Amino acid sequence: MMSTGFSWGTQALSESTEVNSGLGDLPTSIPRYTPNLKPVNNNHHSNGKKRRYSEDQESKVVKPTGNRKHYTTPSTYYKSKKSRTPKIMGQKLPINRLVEALDHTSLQRLLESLIHEHPEISNTIDKISPKPTLTDSIELIKQKFNSIMHHLPYKCDTESDYSYLRIKTHLNEFLNCLSDFILNFLPPIETNVFNSLKFLDEVTDLIHTLPNFSNSEFQYTKSMAYEQISNTWLIVLNHKMRPDDGTNNNNTSNTNEALSSSSSPSPVAQCNMENSAQLIKIIDELNLQQKLAKHDNMSIGKFKLVVEFVNSEIENYENFNHTVTNNGGILNDLITVDYSNFSIAARTSH
């Protein structure tokens, strides 16, 4: 039973096993006399040598000597393999990709938070930000207005106090936004009179369309809104820039001065007359005379001064054109000369 547990026995080992198999399970300490098994003992002696040789070979394979420098341990192999493979780790998005992924609302909140944390960048944003166009400005204010209408209760009187309380927050947001954009469309920030008047006409219509809540607070707020918008109409219509110093000048007084003067008008008066002609053209293009009359009727007389100013401008301009036409006819009569006396026949007759 010397080779129990091993699997690399030789043929001689098998023969020895067959011979010894008939001995039975006798104790190994009892000596026995077996004169006829000498060949078997020789085989057993040679088998022991083979087994020792196999164990020596196994020890050489499993336990290499320290002189073999080319042998690489598994840990060293893994380290060299790890150094050749780049380590891949997760990382955050670049700023440009992060901004691209944000929607309008998220980007707006991000900018507001950034300005809140760093107020010093407000001037920089104001300088590099593009100016909102007339169309975009009106569209934004209409969105604020639609927010009011969408939050009105369905099963309740539209003009009740309950309805007003439901939309009060959205109404304040609408009026605040309206106030900011009105100031942005006033001179000298906005130099295009057409854009200013077009904007004022659009927002005045929105004020008319607001539900007429019976709440006294709303009635006061609406009345104040009409008065402020009416004043901005007058500011834009009466804004005439002088070419010399850029200060405001009353166009009506200069028109009357030009009409009453028998001599040619001064350069300032002439410039104001040109501005007045441009204003009359814009009033005609926007049909403001009729629209302002409607605004005055809808606001119960809040635009009376604006209507009177526009009518006065139109009347003065028509009077000026009529005066220039008449003066031109008189001047033509004064310089008319009878050239018949200077004919060759008349000169020879003398």
Swiss-Prot record:
Which controlled-vocabulary keywords does the entry list? Cytoplasm, Nucleus, Protein transport, Transport
One BP annotation, GO: nuclear protein quality control by the ubiquitin-proteasome system
GO molecular function term, any single one: proteasome binding
Listed Pfam families: Cut8
Keyword RNA-binding applies: no
Which InterPro entries does the entry link to? Answer: Cut8/Sts1_fam (IPR013868), Cut8/Sts1_sf (IPR038422)
Where in or outside the cell it occurs: the entry states:
Cytoplasm; Nucleus
Q: What is its main location?
A: cytoplasm
Query: Which residues lie within the region annotated Disordered?
Result: 17-84, 244-269
Compositional bias segments (type: Low complexity): 247-266
Query: What does UniProt give as GO cellular component?
Result: cytoplasm; nuclear membrane
Assembly state and interactors? Binds the proteasome.
Function per UniProt: Involved in ubiquitin-mediated protein degradation. Regulatory factor in the ubiquitin/proteasome pathway that controls the turnover of proteasome substrates. Targets proteasomes to the nucleus and facilitates the degradation of nuclear proteins.
Would you identify the family this protein belongs to, as annotated?
Belongs to the cut8/STS1 family.
Q: Which PANTHER family match?
A: FI02826P (PTHR28032:SF1)
The entry's protein name is: Tethering factor for nuclear proteasome STS1
- What lineage is this protein's organism placed in? Eukaryota, Fungi, Dikarya, Ascomycota, Saccharomycotina
